[in-house]
Amino acid sequence: MVHMHITAWALGLILFFVAYSLYSAGRKGKGVHMGLRLMYIIIIVTGFMLYMSIVKTATGSMHMWYGLKMLTGILVIGGMEMVLVKMSKNKPTGAVWGLFIVALVAVFYLGLKLPIGWKVF
């Protein structure tokens, strides 16, 4: 399940940047954007399944940290969607990019710091 979740995130980020480049070039990126929305659903479902499997075995404050990581992941998805919608409507995206970057860094940090992630930190 972890590999499916990571693969969904990788595909989601790739589709996000492809849709962003299409919108910034003035082309229609609606099809890629819809594919990205499908990836959002897969990311949320696999993340929730991972969270539920962790709840069964986690001890101490691990529930809180994984819950925080799940909420931060939803913020990343929200930031991605807001950037693309504002780009498609030719509105400024500066603040939304800030939200997206901060949430992405936080979710990567939590993902690498917590026990299921890689042992980088």
UniProtKB/Swiss-Prot annotation:
GO terms for cellular component: plasma membrane. It comes from the Bacteria. It is a multi-pass membrane protein. The chain crosses the membrane at residues 6-26, 38-58, 65-85, 92-112. Keywords: Cell membrane, Membrane, Transmembrane, Transmembrane helix. It is found in: Cell membrane. InterPro entries: UPF0344. It holds the Pfam family DUF1516. Belongs to the UPF0344 family. This is UPF0344 protein BCG9842_B4136. The lineage of its organism: Bacteria, Bacillati, Bacillota, Bacilli, Bacillales.
